[in-house]
């Protein structure tokens, strides 16, 4: 099968995307597919029209590959691809929209506020009064923890919002949930083993903890009571279903000291690097990396 792998682009997550792309390329070639690597730019529609592949593997991260626009282009061109469709991709990529959906569906998620400009300190004080301290400040449509800050004082919030605004026109100011970080991956609706993420030498699961070797420890199964784990998995499953995701998808959950799960977000194009969580969850379920890649392709073509 002739497969085009899209990786790179000009996203802040470009380097992660390139690593994912190379990992997918190696797996596809091992499986016997003919692979063309494309670093997409403005000429992508023309390139795909002139040399249409049998399948497009999206290994992009960030808004360039996850906000539904690329999915819409591929649908228009009639080219099958991995991951969720236009609507689910757009909802999951926009953290404000997805948070509103979670609230409407009764899915537990941390309280939040939204900023579109650098706030005054008085506004920051009101946020902290409502949300507590600290808060997590993040771009509304970013990933890989790029532009994310934990702010503990009102005076720190303007700079945190200013940083996040470099990556998104909207910024989410979110209640910080202490406790454990859990991620749950689904493969075509099948719940894969949950993973607990324990950052090493860091306050939270930042970019280095995600992608640097040794940046975090992953525990399978998580160190949770059975009923708490079940509640966490159920919340993650409901979030993925609410978004309308398909294929391989991952939901991130915080579990507070009282054992209550809080859904943070849904990722419709999980990373596929050597340290990525979704492939690790698949491996724990007995599905190796090449099998995972082929299964995603086969299901996308059904």
Curated annotation (Swiss-Prot):
ATP binds at residues 128-183. Binds 2 magnesium or manganese ions per subunit. One of its GO terms (biological process) is cell wall organization. Its cofactor is Mg(2+); Mn(2+). It is found in: Cytoplasm. Keywords: ATP-binding, Cell shape, Cell wall biogenesis/degradation, Cytoplasm, Ligase, Magnesium, Manganese, Metal-binding, Nucleotide-binding, Peptidoglycan synthesis. The keyword Magnesium applies. Its EC number is 6.3.2.4. GO terms for molecular function: ATP binding; D-alanine-D-alanine ligase activity; metal ion binding. GO terms for cellular component: cytoplasm. It catalyses: 2 D-alanine + ATP = D-alanyl-D-alanine + ADP + phosphate + H(+). Its main location: cytoplasm. Pathway: Cell wall biogenesis; peptidoglycan biosynthesis. Residues 99-298 form the ATP-grasp domain. Mg(2+) 2 binds at residues 265, 267. It holds the Pfam family Dala_Dala_lig_N. Signal peptide: none annotated. Mg(2+) 1 binds at residues 252, 265. HAMAP family: Dala_Dala_lig (MF_00047). Cell wall formation. PANTHER family: D-ALANINE--D-ALANINE LIGASE (PTHR23132), D-ALANINE--D-ALANINE LIGASE B (PTHR23132:SF23). Belongs to the D-alanine--D-alanine ligase family. This is D-alanine--D-alanine ligase. The lineage of its organism: Bacteria, Bacillati, Cyanobacteriota, Cyanophyceae, Gloeobacterales.
């Amino acid at each position: 099968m002739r497969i085009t792998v899209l990786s790179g682009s000009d996203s802040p997550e470009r380097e992660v995307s390139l690593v994912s792309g190379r990992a997918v390329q190696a797996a596809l070639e091992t499986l016997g597919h003919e692979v063309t690597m494309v670093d997409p730019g403005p000429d992508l529609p023309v390139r795909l029209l002139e040399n249409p592949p049998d399948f497009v593997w999206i290994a992009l991260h960030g808004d360039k590959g996850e906000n539904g626009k690329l999915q819409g282009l591929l649908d228009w061109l009639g080219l099958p691809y991995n991951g969720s469709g236009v609507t689910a991709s757009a909802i999951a990529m926009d953290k404000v929209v997805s948070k509103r959906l979670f609230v409407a569906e009764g899915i537990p998620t941390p309280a939040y506020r939204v900023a579109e400009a650098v706030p005054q300190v008085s506004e920051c004080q009101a946020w902290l009064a409502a949300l507590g301290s600290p808060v997590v400040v993040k771009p509304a449509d970013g990933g890989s923890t790029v532009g994310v800050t934990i702010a503990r004082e009102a005076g720190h919030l303007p700079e945190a919002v200013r940083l996040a605004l470099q990556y998104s026109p909207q910024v989410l100011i979110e209640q910080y949930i202490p406790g454990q970080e859990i991620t749950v991956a689904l493969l075509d609706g099948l719940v894969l083993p949950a993973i607990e993420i324990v950052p090493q030498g860091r306050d939270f699961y930042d970019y280095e903890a995600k992608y640097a070797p040794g940046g975090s420890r992953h525990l399978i199964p998580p160190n949770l009571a059975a009923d708490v784990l079940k509640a966490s998995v159920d919340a993650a499953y409901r979030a993925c279903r609410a978004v309308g995701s398909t294929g391989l998808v991952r939901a991130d959950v915080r579990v507070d000291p009282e054992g209550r799960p809080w859904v943070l977000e849904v990722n419709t194009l999980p990373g596929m690097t050597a340290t990525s969580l979704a492939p690790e969850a698949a491996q724990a379920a007995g599905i190796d990396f090449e099998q995972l890649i082929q299964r995603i392709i086969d299901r996308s073509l059904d």
